[in-house]
Amino acid sequence: MKAEYQGNEGFLQRDSVEHKGYAEAQSTDRREGKERDGASDLLEAILDRDNLNRAYKRVKRNHGAAGIDGVTVEEALPWLKEHREELLQSIRDGSYMPSPVRRKEIPKPDGGVRKLGIPTVVDRVIQQAIAQKLQSIWEPLFSDSSYGYRPKRSAQQAIQKVKEYAEEGYRYAVSVDLSKYFDTLNHELLMNLLHKQIQDMRVLRLVKKYLKSGVMENGVICKTEEGSPQGGAAVAFAGKHLPQ
């Protein structure tokens, strides 16, 4: 069954006064975003040399672990240089297939575990390159009250905003945590949201491949029919931000 996204107007009572003006600004920004970044050449912007170099540097700074192939960030660089054109061509013609992510469980303070999906370095670079371009498309559309995982935004700024609201007379704050959000993310819903701003079907198909790439756990590859691995930049960006 096809999932449809419906907004929830009035959910944030504190922002109800500014909602109308914000919605009008969203409408304008959406049109501009489509003209600027949602055209049929979005994949070429993702595969631009400068964007890919920036993506690799970001992956390197993060010092992440190796994926299922056991290749580290430093070891991947010579391969990327040697096979660059072959890799880019396979992405362009749609033959590229992402590798399954490596499952890793991180203990949580409450005694549970947080499941991470660690992609290979090559896939991390590609996903980071995608995420960088998705960020430029969606950033103008996000609520001004959103502070999580955004450039030049921080938890400290969110706390400061709560203090300002308290000084204005507001007395209640709500803390919400969605249980197993990334583990149960609906792929069809996510792709519908992406399609609203992206017309380059090659990009949509590539993101969907990452969602469906599977998980390797104890040497066994399992299909991923729902959920988004916490570890890949592109699917993590989409999972965190698009349902706003």
PLM feature segments, named:
Residues 68, 132, 176-178:
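Residues immediately flanking
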Residues 55, 126-127, 183-185:
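Short helix/loop capping segments that flank catalytic or ligand/cofactor-binding pockets
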Residues 110-128:
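Glycine-rich active-site/cofactor-binding loop and its immediate structural neighborhood
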Residues 55-59, 129, 206-211:
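Short alpha-helical scaffolding segments that buttress acidic/His motifs in well-ordered protein cores
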Residues 75-98:
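Amphipathic alpha-helical blocks
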Residues 90-105, 109, 141-244:
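Conserved polymerase palm-domain catalytic core
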